[in-house]
Every structure is written in structure tokens, then in C-alpha cells.
């Protein structure tokens, strides 16, 4: 659970400062961890996108 929360915070922060966060991530997290973060980011991005699309389709 704690790991998931940390990843979520990292994703939200990375959106604000991509350049600064990328450097921090490379130093703080090893390469394998970065791959996991990217995968989680894609999964999280896809879920909200699908929900928004469904809502938009339902409104009209």
C-alpha cells in the first residue's frame, strides 16, 4: 500500500516538474524501479481516460 501511494505521489509531482523529477527519480530509484513507475503511470492514465470517455459519451 505504501509503495502505491509513493508511486502516485511521484506521478503527480512528475507532471508538475518533469525535468527536475526525472533527475531525482534517476538518482533515487534504480532503473528497474523506473520501468515499474512508467508501467503504473500508463495503467493509471488509461483508467481515468476510459472513464472520462464513457462519461462524455453518456452525457450527449
UniProtKB/Swiss-Prot annotation:
Question: Is Chloroplast included in the keywords of this UniProt record?
Answer: no
- Report whether Signal shows up as a keyword of the record: no
One Pfam family assigned to this protein is Gemini_C4
The UniProt entry, under InterPro entries, shows: Gemini_C4
**What's a BP term from Gene Ontology annotated to this protein?**
symbiont-mediated suppression of host innate immune response
Name the keywords, alphabetized: Host-virus interaction, Inhibition of host innate immune response by virus, Suppressor of RNA silencing, Viral immunoevasion
Source organism's superkingdom? Answer: Viruses
What does it do?
Pathogenicity determinant. May act as a suppressor of RNA-mediated gene silencing, also known as post-transcriptional gene silencing (PTGS), a mechanism of plant viral defense that limits the accumulation of viral RNAs.
The UniProt similarity line reads: Belongs to the geminiviridae protein AC4/C4 family.
Name of the protein this chain belongs to: Protein AC4
Organism (species): Pepper huasteco yellow vein virus
Amino acid at each position: 500500500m505504501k509503495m502505491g501511494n509513493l508511486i502516485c505521489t511521484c506521478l503527480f509531482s512528475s507532471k508538475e516538474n518533469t525535468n527536475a523529477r526525472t533527475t531525482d527519480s534517476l538518482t533515487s530509484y534504480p532503473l528497474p524501479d523506473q520501468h515499474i513507475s512508467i508501467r503504473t503511470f500508463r495503467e493509471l492514465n488509461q483508467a481515468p481516460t476510459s472513464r472520462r470517455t464513457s462519461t462524455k459519451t453518456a452525457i450527449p
